[in-house]
Amino acid sequence: MIRTDWTMAEAWAIHALPFADLMHRAQTLHRAHFDPNAIETASLLSIKTGGCPEDCGYCSQSAHHDTGVKATKLMGTEEVLAAARRAKASGAQRFCMGAAWRSPKDRDMDKLCDMVRGVAELGLETCMTLGMLSPEQVARLKAAGLDFYNHNIDTSPEYYAQIASTRTMENRLDTVEQVRKGGIKVCCGGILGMGEAEEDRIAMLVTLATLPAHPDSVPVNLWNEIEGVPVQARAQAVDPFALVRIVALARILMPASVVRLSAGRTGMSDELQALCFLAGANSIFVGDQLLTTGNPAAWKDQDLLSRLGMHIAPAQARPRVAAE
């Protein structure tokens, strides 16, 4: 049963279960909704890097922080499509395009829509993350064929003011709702390791699990150490078992959502990734680069999945159970 009325008390109780019991509950729900041996793959491209006016304290692309990231202009459509072809050849099923903006300018919408149409014509699912959107922009992207829109809430409502001041949690949730109402699938998750308390991680998932509809995809990111950003001063490494518990809780609270291991996999052992898959994670980014951070080499992912007896879900098919 899909619920959107979870409470913090319920989530805390689940999170605190003995590890074996938590894993059993998560894996049971995972098998009810997905093929447990199938992994969804996506590739991520920064189509406009740096110079972002937002002050998100974790981000290397903010114009407020001296991180060495140079601002670029929006890529040309053909350059983006060439990258999409390479992503498809490397095994990606979805192509995500990210731009470091507060929100896209109307003058860029024609080019963005051309990118969406071009990537879709290659047989890839399309995803964008461009910041906040107006209802009119949502409608244009939907008409162009955009499948997914990523807009993370990053952390709990209570901790959010500690990491950003130029936009609020309400701004983020409003964008998520605009996207959902506009008929585009929602990709929305958060980041661990920014100095937040365990309670904040749980509250972040409860926030997502009590939306009118659960996100279609829930990315779980580990913060990558970045010189020159405010979060660096209070960032703390995430205990491996704490990560697995959050993945399991995400699977239990949102059983039909794809849970993606996103940024931070370069610092995860094969064993930790395997535990995350067992806990319900069923999507990864492929390719050597995310937006501005590294990602495991393709051969490492292929080797890991092979050793685990897992496989990439067929193109254009989410890793659902056969009955669905």
Swiss-Prot record:
- The UniProt record lists the EC number as 2.8.1.6
Keywords, alphabetical: 2Fe-2S, 4Fe-4S, Biotin biosynthesis, Iron, Iron-sulfur, Metal-binding, S-adenosyl-L-methionine, Transferase
Q: Which PROSITE patterns match?
A: RADICAL_SAM
Instruction: Give the top-level enzyme category.
Output: transferase
Q: How is the cofactor bound?
A: Binds 1 [4Fe-4S] cluster. The cluster is coordinated with 3 cysteines and an exchangeable S-adenosyl-L-methionine.
- What does the sequence similarity comment in the record state about its family? Belongs to the radical SAM superfamily. Biotin synthase family.
Entry-linked PANTHER family: BIOTIN SYNTHASE (PTHR22976), BIOTIN SYNTHASE, MITOCHONDRIAL (PTHR22976:SF2)
What name does this protein carry? Biotin synthase 1
Q: What is the lineage of its organism?
A: Bacteria, Pseudomonadati, Pseudomonadota, Alphaproteobacteria, Rhodobacterales
Q: Which gene encodes it?
A: bioB1
